[in-house]
């Protein structure tokens, strides 16, 4: 299971961003080449394991977009993108995010009080992006049904759970050891389900 995902992760180059070990992968960066079979495998496993039920899928720019697109096509659930750019639309909510290697503003549009949503992103690492978005959605009185990432790296999922009460569900857990990506399965029914 998830053979393409695991192989792509194990073959990922690792670079340093300050003190942060950053792996470069099609799932998290769109480079090297993102094969459609990889996206298909990831989306099928998300649907199989987590069976998203919601009015909307919320993804975070930029690397959540391709996962939300494929998931939307598989489930028939429309998606909306939390953007890094302000549009000034009525009801727009600005969110300040801090990660292990950057900080900035995100903007939520097209999400209303009472909406039932699934939040999807490529990876949870420090938890900074998910924390900011989930806290904003809570303030907006949005019904967050699930929080799903393809990859769990570091302590971010624990931080998100402790600070928001939401369990981040992921397909695999990774760690960077001696400049290489190590991949660990998270079995269905495992700690994130």
UniProtKB/Swiss-Prot annotation:
It comes from the Archaea. Its main location: cytoplasm. It is found in: Cytoplasm. Pathway: Purine metabolism; IMP biosynthesis via salvage pathway; IMP from hypoxanthine: step 1/1. GO terms for biological process: IMP salvage; purine ribonucleoside salvage. Signal peptide: none annotated. InterPro entries: HGPRTase-like, PRibTrfase_dom, PRTase-like, Pur/Pyrimidine_PRTase. One of its GO terms (cellular component) is cytoplasm. GO terms for molecular function: guanine phosphoribosyltransferase activity; hypoxanthine phosphoribosyltransferase activity. Its EC number is 2.4.2.8. It catalyses: IMP + diphosphate = hypoxanthine + 5-phospho-alpha-D-ribose 1-diphosphate; GMP + diphosphate = guanine + 5-phospho-alpha-D-ribose 1-diphosphate. Keywords: Cytoplasm, Glycosyltransferase, Purine salvage, Transferase. Homodimer. Belongs to the purine/pyrimidine phosphoribosyltransferase family. Archaeal HPRT subfamily. HAMAP family: Hypx_phosphoribosyltr. Catalyzes a salvage reaction resulting in the formation of IMP that is energically less costly than de novo synthesis. This is Hypoxanthine/guanine phosphoribosyltransferase. The gene is hpt.
């Amino acid at each position: 299971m998830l053979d393409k995902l695991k192989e792509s992760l194990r073959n990922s180059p690792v670079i340093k961003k300050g003190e942060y070990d950053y792996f470069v992968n099609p799932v998290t960066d769109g480079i090297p080449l993102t094969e459609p079979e990889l996206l298909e495998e990831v989306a099928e496993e998300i649907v199989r394991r987590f069976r998203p039920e919601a009015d909307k899928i919320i993804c975070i720019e930029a690397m959540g977009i391709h996962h939300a697109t494929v998931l939307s096509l598989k489930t028939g659930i429309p998606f909306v993108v939390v953007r890094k750019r302000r549009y000034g639309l009525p009801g727009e909510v600005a969110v300040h995010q801090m990660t292990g290697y950057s900080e900035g503003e995100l903007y939520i549009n097209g999400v209303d009080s009472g909406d039932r949503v699934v939040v999807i992103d490529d990876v949870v690492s420090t938890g900074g992006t998910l924390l900011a978005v989930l806290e904003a959605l809570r303030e907006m009185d949005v019904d967050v049904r699930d929080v799903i990432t393809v990859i769990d790296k570091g302590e971010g999922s624990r931080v998100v759970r402790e600070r928001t009460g939401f369990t981040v569900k992921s397909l695999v857990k990774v760690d960077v050891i001696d400049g290489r990506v190590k991949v660990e399965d998270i079995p269905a029914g495992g700690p994130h389900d």
